[in-house]
Amino acid sequence: MSKALLEIQNLHVRVEEMEILHGVDLAVGQDETHVLMGPNGTGKSTLGYAITGNPTYSVTGGSIIFNGEDITELPVNERAKKGIFLSFQNPLEVPGVTLSAFIRSALEQKTGDRLRLWDFKKKLKETMALLNMDESYAERDLNVGFSGGEKKKSEILQMLM
């Protein structure tokens, strides 16, 4: 395995009074793909939420290392700025908010800078081309009427931007 991009060490996570994860260890290297599989209720989603910093999930032991930095105590917004992203099985549909507007707003929140529209649209177009995604999706309401595959492409686009 290459140097770990994400390393979970002896992670213990609880929700309210119930410990869900009991000493989980995991290492994911750069350019590796891992799949978590198991029956319902075995902690797959809990691990994802703990990695993203969802405050409902309390890390009571262990650590989460991302790009060599311990992010265990960072709030969710700081983890997101570092590139931590959780893809949902059924992403929310947001009528009235275009995919383009959503991504631009998220980028501005991440960077703290107001993005020039021309520069943003250029980067958006280039990134959509990488995904073989029709540019018209940028002006559609976020995930509204998207097929399952289009929703996944939308999430990947958000992550890449």
Predicted regions and their residues:
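Conserved structural motif at the start of ABC-family nucleotide-binding domains
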Residues: 6-8, 21-23, 28
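Short coil-to-beta microelement around the adenine-binding A-loop and adjacent beta1/P-loop entry
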Residues: 15-21, 78
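Helix-to-loop junction immediately C-terminal to a conserved catalytic motif
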Residues: 52
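ABC-family P-loop ATPase nucleotide-binding domains
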Residues: 92-161
